[in-house]
């Protein structure tokens, strides 16, 4: 059977999604379990998702599934039932429902087979990814935040940490998850007697990170079940204080969910308080950066005067300038480590 995929242009699909009158629900989920033939599973799931008008990004590998999707509100329960029935390993799977959702997170379904559902760079044959740390629920998270023997480790990238994080959480400065894993072990060597609490957006990265820490001799390891999304939802439902500060970066068109009223980041151009990510409008750049409304107007959505000038050129001249240029204009640091541009929304598996 040929590989199933979308054949309609992105512009047409986006216009169709924006014209929809039915509300949509943004959902994320993951599951580490053995998939014997990811390609066969991919095609079967593609047909199931397409029949229910599901959009989003789904990765499959022998180690499991990782998905961020948008489902028509009227199809959510049908989707849940069919997903649970698809494989015994998926029965009862936790679905993280978006907190701050306009239903415009995705407009196309992209489903890919990869070597890993999270690019971890681990090649140790003795590593047991199932030997994970203990789960923490919302009330337990708050208790740990008040425990002087606990250290919270943020297993997200710098651009995610920059706009929001737990109180006093430690950032592991790196551009990718695979770079963070060895760095986390190195940074925590002097704190093996502490309680290590790991977290990420929806749980997939911190779950594997907790197993990696245990593999490297850390015995007191926890991770937040369902990540920031599930913590904030459960804390609100249970009337608990929400101790996450700022915005939770998400890997779709929204680029963020408001968790608290505090704005802890700043515009990369003028320094004003701001936590709104955008991609540079220059097609030769598309750098991910933080831009306030004033600078968005001043620079016409671009990251610099150079990009502003280039984006105003005739299309043929823009293409000529882009030819042979591997990266964008590299005005801002994506992380503290090095200059790096990101085309479009970052890949959540990196």
From Swiss-Prot:
Tell me the Pfam families matching this sequence. Answer: Rhodanese, Rhodanese_C, UPF0176_N
Q: Which GO terms describe its biological process?
A: tRNA modification
Q: Where do the catalytic residues lie?
A: 200
Which key words are in the record? Oxidoreductase, tRNA processing
Has keyword Translocase? no
**PROSITE patterns in UniProt:** RHODANESE_3 (PS50206)
Enzyme Commission code(s) on record: 1.14.-.-
Q: Which residues form a coiled coil?
A: none
Q: Which GO terms describe its molecular function?
A: oxidoreductase activity, acting on paired donors, with incorporation or reduction of molecular oxygen
Instruction: Answer yes or no on keyword Oxidoreductase.
Output: yes
Residues making up the signal peptide according to the UniProt record? none
Listed as disulfide-bonded, the cysteine pairs are: none
Q: Which InterPro entries match?
A: Rhodanese-like_dom, Rhodanese-like_dom_sf, Rhodanese_C, TrhO, TRHO_N
CDD domains linked to this entry = RHOD_YceA
Query: According to the UniProt record, what class of enzyme is this?
Result: oxidoreductase
* Residue stretches making up the Rhodanese domain: 146-240
Catalytically driven reaction(s): uridine(34) in tRNA + AH2 + O2 = 5-hydroxyuridine(34) in tRNA + A + H2O
Q: Which family does it belong to?
A: Belongs to the TrhO family.
- Job of this protein: Catalyzes oxygen-dependent 5-hydroxyuridine (ho5U) modification at position 34 in tRNAs, the first step in 5-carboxymethoxyuridine (cmo5U) biosynthesis. May be part of an alternate pathway, which is able to bypass cmo5U biogenesis in a subset of tRNAs under aerobic conditions.
Q: PANTHER family this protein is in?
A: TRNA URIDINE(34) HYDROXYLASE, UPF0176 PROTEIN YCEA
Q: What is this protein called?
A: tRNA uridine(34) hydroxylase
Q: Which organism is it from?
A: Escherichia coli O6:H1 (strain CFT073 / ATCC 700928 / UPEC)
Taxonomy of the source species = Bacteria, Pseudomonadati, Pseudomonadota, Gammaproteobacteria, Enterobacterales
